[in-house]
């Protein structure tokens, strides 16, 4: 397994992969990928460059993206797909997943999260710790839902959208693409593409033309 990233999110996903591997014994080795640092030992494993994968048969490994910035997840996903590499799906053993939920390749579901009945999670979604996704919700590609957040039943979350720590969405609320929901926000109304919302109740503060959550 190659974990694309070597930041704080990546080491959390490394721990998740180890927990999954205890039960599944799927991976003989778990690597971290970081093209901006030298290849060396990091967090008890090998940190390598993306190009290292070219020396291994494509069917012999899988990728998972461990980056919390939705636009970066989208970029890395396209890079992986262009190479024809396979995506893993990592679901913590402690997560509660409905048998009717549909979780696509590349998705991450962290510890103690709940994915309820008839939920659809498209490719490359990321759920943090203790996230609740209500029945019939639809999370589109590259959605990131941070720890302790709740997505109400029947809601739709657009592509490349970020839901901050401890935020909540009312049922049947729709978030557009490239939306940023700030930490601790309570979303009672639908949000248009590219908007940033904050507060309780959540109000639009500004657009997100750069489609960036984490800015230097």
Give residue ranges: language-model regions.
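Short amphipathic alpha-helical segments
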Residues: 14-17, 44, 75-79, 121, ...
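Short alpha-helical
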Residues: 8-11, 71-72, 186
């Amino acid at each position: 397994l190659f974990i694309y990233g070597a930041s704080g999110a990546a080491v959390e996903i490394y721990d998740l992969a180890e927990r999954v591997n205890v039960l599944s014994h799927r991976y003989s080795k778990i690597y971290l990928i970081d093209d901006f640092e030298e290849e060396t030992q990091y967090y008890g494993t090998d940190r390598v460059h993306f190009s290292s994968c070219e020396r291994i048969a494509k069917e012999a490994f899988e990728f998972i993206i461990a980056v919390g910035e939705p636009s970066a997840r989208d970029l890395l996903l396209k890079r992986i797909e262009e190479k024809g590499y396979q995506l893993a799906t990592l679901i913590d053993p402690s997560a509660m997943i409905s048998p009717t939920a549909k979780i696509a390749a590349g998705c991450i579901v962290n510890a103690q999260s709940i994915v309820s009945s008839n939920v659809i999670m498209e490719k490359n979604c990321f759920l943090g710790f203790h996230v609740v996704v209500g029945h019939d919700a639809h999370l589109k590609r590259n959605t990131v839902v941070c720890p302790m957040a709740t997505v109400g039943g029947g809601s739709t979350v657009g592509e490349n959208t970020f839901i901050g720590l401890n935020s909540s969405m009312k049922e049947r609320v729709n978030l557009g693409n490239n939306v940023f929901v700030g930490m601790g926000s309570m979303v009672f109304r639908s949000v248009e593409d590219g908007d940033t919302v904050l507060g309780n109740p959540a109000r639009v503060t500004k657009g997100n033309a750069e489609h960036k959550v984490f800015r230097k």
